[in-house]
Regions:
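Rossmann-like NAD(P) dinucleotide-binding subdomain of oxidoreductase/dehydrogenase enzymes
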Residues: 120-262
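Structural signal for hydrophobic packing residues in well-ordered secondary-structure cores
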Residues: 52, 56, 71-78, 82, ...
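Residue-level signal for inorganic ion chemistry
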Residues: 10, 27, 63, 85, ...
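Terminal low-complexity tails and localization/encapsulation signals of metabolic enzymes
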Residues: 1-32, 65, 69, 118-143, ...
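Glycine-rich loop-to-alpha-helix module at the N-terminal edge of alpha/beta enzyme cores
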Residues: 30-118
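Short alpha-helical
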Residues: 39, 76, 80, 91, ...
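ALDH superfamily catalytic-core signature
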Residues: 218, 226-364
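Short linear capping/connector segments at secondary-structure termini
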Residues: 84-92, 122-128, 313-319
Length: 366
């Protein structure tokens, strides 16, 4: 079992209640994570508030150095990041290496570099010089999803802290392992206590407490549209700064002059990357009627030959869906399509896999 704890005020702490973290590829329990309640979040907000004055008083150059330290420490553990991400999400490890690990590291480096030119702006006028000076907002409440756990957590934390804000972050309870690794890295490099606080738990408990807390000045949420609406309804009357990245429904348009042999692998990748669990993925293909038959035959054949299986194998194109509940939801939409007259040309069923993956949340690309 992997140990996962909250990271508050520079210390790893447990909670009274826990949540099981399940490996979706095998159904095995891999960790028991904190189920943070309002008092646990309150401690994290207090720590962030206490650290705010000192952290914001540092120069951009000083804060930038900390981002570079974090990036270097993450890079030293890049293979561990990929392994944990694959274990937690069910995605193929080759994808976790190429995207999750590499881009999480790159996020800290990018925002360290970006901040060099993001301090002051000066506008000369005939009789005056106007200056725009950027100041920290305060405490940033950051809530991230399960599909790209560390990638999106680092995408939020890095710009928040380099600009002088302190952070209370809540990763998805489905995929907490790399957030815990990030806390270990932050502790290892010696980032001042309270600058980054990470609490685990459920959205309607820990997440809602972060969003509604009067001392949290900014909310950045990535997740479902329905939840995003609730976040906005809570944050807007409090005049919090609010950033929402929500669901997508994307079309791929295929015209007559398409080079099919080049396009089909890319269209399949855009639709099934990360088992299709990315808001940027193409969820439907609109095809010119002139090439419908030829394109459909080739595309279905390509998708039908994509390999579903062991996420730790470099031979697997697709791994497991993130949870059994999510697989059930996807299957319900497939059944709905059939009831409404749709024809399943490939996939739509659970693959036959050897133990222990026969107990996992796998589904053929459909």
């Amino acid at each position: 079992m992997i140990t996962v704890q909250n990271y508050v005020n520079g210390t790893f702490v447990s909670t009274k209640e826990t949540i099981e973290d399940i490996n979706p590829a095998t159904g095995e329990i891999i960790a028991n994570i904190p189920r943070s309640k309002s008092d646990d979040v309150e401690k994290a907000v207090l720590a962030a508030d206490n650290a705010r004055e000192y952290w914001s008083s540092l120069s951009l150059d000083d804060r930038r150095v900390w981002l570079e330290k974090i990036a270097n420490a993450l890079e030293a553990r890049s293979e561990e990041i990929a392994t944990l991400e694959s274990l937690d999400t069910g995605k193929p490890i080759k994808l976790a290496r190429a995207v999750d690990a590499s881009r999480s590291i790159a996020n800290f480096r990018f925002f360290a570099e970006f901040s060099k030119d993001y301090n002051k702006e000066r506008f000369e006028m005939d009789d005056a010089t106007n200056h725009v000076i950027f100041k920290p907002v305060g405490i940033a409440g950051l809530i991230t999803p399960w599909n790209l756990p560390l990638y999106l957590l680092s995408w939020k934390i890095a710009p928040a802290i380099v600009m002088g804000n302190t952070v209370v972050a809540k990763p998805s309870e489905l995929t907490p392992l790399t957030a815990n690794l990030l806390a270990e890295v932050i502790h290892e490099v010696g980032l001042p206590a309270g600058v980054v606080n990470i609490v685990h738990g459920l959205g309607y408990e820990a997440g809602q407490t972060i969003v509604s807390h009067p001392k949290v000045n900014l909310i950045s949420f990535t997740g479902g549209t329905i939840t995003g609406k609730k976040v906005a309804e809570t944050a807007a009357p409090m005049f919090k700064k609010l950033s929402l990245e929500l669901g997508g429904k994307n079309s791929t348009i295929v015209l007559d002059d398409v080079k099919m042999d080049d396009a089909i692998p890319e269209i399949a990748r855009s639709g099934f990357l990360n088992q299709g669990q990315v808001c940027l993925c193409g969820s439907r293909v609109l095809i010119s009627h002139k090439i419908w038959d030829e394109f459909t035959e080739k595309f279905v054949n390509y998708v039908d030959n994509m390999k579903v299986g062991d996420p730790s194998s470099d031979n697997s194109d697709l791994g497991a869906l993130v949870s059994f509940a999510h697989r059930d939801k996807v299957e319900s939409y497939i059944h709905l399509a059939e009831r409404e007259g749709g024809e399943i040309l490939c996939g739509g069923k659970r693959p036959s896999l050897e133990s222990p993956f026969d107990k996992g949340a796998f589904l053929k690309p459909t």
